[in-house]
Amino acid sequence: MLEKLKKEVLSANLELVKQNLVIFTWGNVSGIDRDKRIVAIKPSGVPYEKLQCKDIVLVDLEGHVIEGSLRPSSDTPTHLELYKNFKEISGVCHTHSKFATIWAQINKAIPCLGTTHADYFYGEIPVTEKLSAKEFENYEESIGKSIVEKFKNINPLNVPGALVSDHGPFTWGETPLKSVENAAVLEYIAELAFFCELSKAQGQEIDINLLDKHFFRKHGKDAYYGQSKNI
């Protein structure tokens, strides 16, 4: 069932290792079939080197397992909240990549300090509010809700990622692989911003006109970066 989607999700999860975004069994990627309302996601605690297509778990949007003999990722409720609220996305990625997690642990949004950031994220990468003790009871679902709440006035396609307070980054995209690409870029710009903050000449936030130029030359109806079709 949904073999093509499972293969895409497997490939995206293995890409986490190639991009040095995960260690051990940390991290997960999912994808969704919007027509069937079924999500394919990495199983919980399975080493990447042992992960096979048959291991990818299928769940519905309420978290019920549709297919698979393994438990789905413990982060599944977070993924489901994002799919239910961000209708334009078809892939979600979660890592504990080093520099992005540093920003999450100090509970600070990543400011847009230059054009490398602006090429992918239209403005700062926000950090969610801290969860209350009551919210810990449904921890992973509460994480998803906290991201959705933070994006009430933010287009999730313009800022395809967030930092979860005290925890780490989640990213998303039009495909599972795109969510991983956004995770890799987030980690890179998190490192740049980290060292800018450490430097004596602290970076200033990017001029709004330069932000507009770099983001919209790659995204939107008037984009002109790259080729008109894939090569």
Question: Language-model segments: which ranges?
Answer:
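Glycine-rich flexible loops
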Residues: 1-231
